[in-house]
Structure formats: C-alpha cells, structure tokens
Amino acid sequence: MAKKSMIAKQQRTPKFAVRAYTRCSVCGRPHSVYRDFGLCRVCLRKMANEGLLPGVRKASW
C-alpha cells in the first residue's frame, strides 16, 4: 500500500504537466499501471481471477 501522503500529493495538479503519473486506483501502486483499467498488474490479476472484471479472461493458446 502506498502512503496516504503520497496518494494525496499525487492527486494535486503538478506544477509541470510532465510530472503527472498514474497510480493504481485500488492499492496506490505507482508502477506497472494499466491505463485501460486504472489498476496495477497485481490488482488486475487478482480481480480478473476473481471474475470482477467483465470481459477479461486468461489467455490460452
């Protein structure tokens, strides 16, 4: 879990647009965030396995 202070700091608009970055909407993780879902890879996998994301299924080839 990310610190509450870091989550609050990220929600403010930055002085320069380049400084903006994505964070997981569930756990607050700043790295490996999928923009389509707004989730990090860990939360995405967990929620997909639980069937909480409609239309997402495991790959099989």
Curated annotation (Swiss-Prot):
Zn(2+) binds at C24, C27, C40, C43. Binds 1 zinc ion per subunit. GO terms for cellular component: cytoplasm; small ribosomal subunit. It holds the Pfam family Ribosomal_S14. Its cofactor is Zn(2+). GO terms for molecular function: rRNA binding; structural constituent of ribosome; zinc ion binding. GO terms for biological process: translation. Keywords: Metal-binding, Ribonucleoprotein, Ribosomal protein, RNA-binding, rRNA-binding, Zinc. InterPro entries: Ribosomal_uS14, Ribosomal_uS14_bact, Ribosomal_uS14_CS, Ribosomal_uS14_sf. Part of the 30S ribosomal subunit. Contacts proteins S3 and S10. HAMAP family: Ribosomal_uS14_2_B. Belongs to the universal ribosomal protein uS14 family. Zinc-binding uS14 subfamily. Binds 16S rRNA, required for the assembly of 30S particles and may also be responsible for determining the conformation of the 16S rRNA at the A site. NCBIfam families: PRK08061.1 (NF005974). This is Small ribosomal subunit protein uS14. It comes from Aliarcobacter butzleri (strain RM4018) (Arcobacter butzleri).
